């Protein structure tokens, strides 16, 4: 008897197939773990793909030292509870130079602490394939990127030189020094992610749920005061508002949204009504025209 899969089951099956394909074709894969909701779903899929064995690859977190404290606590707790092999990499040169989003601006900070940090880790451990949680509905440059995204020996992405992907057939051939970035969630939407998290009861960082938090209004965004390093500008005052985050990154560059959605059903209901992209809350996407595509060409995920 033929079984009809639901929409989420089809997405799950596709993602698991992609994850298994990478393990079968590459010598040294790694999964990027940014601690966000997409990473949570991707890790859950990887655990399903190889159960009862653990995923046969490590997780890599590029720590900029400016992540929300709740994110780091959640990362360490998940690593301890799940027992996965976690690599944490920090660009020490950037730390020694005192690079920060406040003094150097979002573009330079992102390039040094995120892009260069990622490239350092990929080179150090000689990973030839790296999973990422990017989705095509997030942003226009990601919308046109392949699921198996080729990178040169310098980790650069050329959007004009992408490989055809017919049905579920993927070209995994690379030369020495080259690599592939793989996006198992490419065809998922933000709503799909939230529905799957609810269905599978996947743990996520508490910042995704609405709560009263200290924020300042800066450049049209609500920036959470996460630690003492956030200095108030003239005229700014700390306000306590019920907010949550649709996307998580470095706290000085991530805007919150006013919300009362403190449960998964409420978040899903909110998603059904929203008409804006979650990436609007990320300052690094707006620091110059075509910002994300330029970052990806330079090696950003």
Curated annotation (Swiss-Prot):
Pfam families: PAPS_reduct. InterPro entries: PAPS_reduct_dom, Rossmann-like_a/b/a_fold, SO4_adenylTrfase_ssu, Sulfate_adenylyltrnsfr_sub2. Pathway: Sulfur metabolism; hydrogen sulfide biosynthesis; sulfite from sulfate: step 1/3. Transmembrane segments: none annotated. Keywords: ATP-binding, Nucleotide-binding, Nucleotidyltransferase, Transferase. Its EC number is 2.7.7.4. The keyword Nucleotide-binding applies. One of its GO terms (molecular function) is sulfate adenylyltransferase (ATP) activity. The keyword Repeat does not apply. Heterodimer composed of CysD, the smaller subunit, and CysN. The gene is cysD. Belongs to the PAPS reductase family. CysD subfamily. It catalyses: sulfate + ATP + H(+) = adenosine 5'-phosphosulfate + diphosphate. With CysN forms the ATP sulfurylase (ATPS) that catalyzes the adenylation of sulfate producing adenosine 5'-phosphosulfate (APS) and diphosphate, the first enzymatic step in sulfur assimilation pathway. APS synthesis involves the formation of a high-energy phosphoric-sulfuric acid anhydride bond driven by GTP hydrolysis by CysN coupled to ATP hydrolysis by CysD. This is Sulfate adenylyltransferase subunit 2. SUPFAM superfamilies: Adenine nucleotide alpha hydrolases-like. NCBIfam families: CysD, PRK05253.1, PRK12563.1. GO terms for biological process: hydrogen sulfide biosynthetic process; sulfate assimilation.
């Amino acid at each position: 008897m033929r079984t009809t899969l639901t929409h989420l089951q089809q997405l799950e099956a596709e993602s698991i197939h992609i994850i298994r394909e990478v393990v079968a074709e590459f010598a040294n894969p790694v999964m990027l773990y940014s601690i966000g909701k997409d990473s949570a779903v991707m890790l859950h899929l990887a655990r399903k793909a190889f159960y009862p064995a653990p995923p046969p690859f490590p997780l890599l977190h590029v720590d900029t030292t400016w992540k929300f404290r709740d994110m780091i606590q959640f990362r360490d707790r998940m690593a301890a509870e799940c027992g996965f092999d976690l690599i944490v990499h920090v660009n020490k040169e950037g730390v020694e130079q005192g690079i920060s989003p406040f003094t150097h601006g979002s573009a330079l900070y992102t390039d040094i602490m995120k892009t260069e940090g990622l490239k350092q880790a990929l080179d150090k451990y000689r990973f030839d394939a790296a999973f990422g949680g990017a989705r095509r509905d997030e942003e226009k440059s990601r919308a046109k990127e392949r699921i198996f995204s080729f990178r040169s020996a310098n980790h650069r992405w050329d959007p004009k030189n992408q490989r055809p992907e017919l049905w579920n057939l993927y070209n995994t051939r690379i030369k020495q020094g080259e690599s592939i970035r793989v996006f198992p969630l490419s065809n998922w939407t933000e709503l799909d992610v939230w529905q799957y998290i609810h269905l599978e009861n996947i743990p996520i960082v508490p910042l995704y749920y609405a709560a009263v938090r200290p924020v300042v209004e800066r450049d049209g965004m609500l920036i959470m005061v996460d630690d003492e390093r956030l200095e108030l500008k003239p005229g700014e005052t700390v306000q306590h508002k019920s907010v949550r985050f649709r996307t998580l990154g470095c706290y000085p560059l991530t805007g919150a949204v006013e919300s009362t959605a403190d449960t998964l059903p409420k978040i899903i209901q909110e998603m059904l009504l929203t008409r804006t992209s979650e990436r609007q809350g990320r300052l690094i996407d707006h620091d110059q025209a075509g910002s994300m595509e330029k970052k990806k060409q330079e090696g950003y995920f």
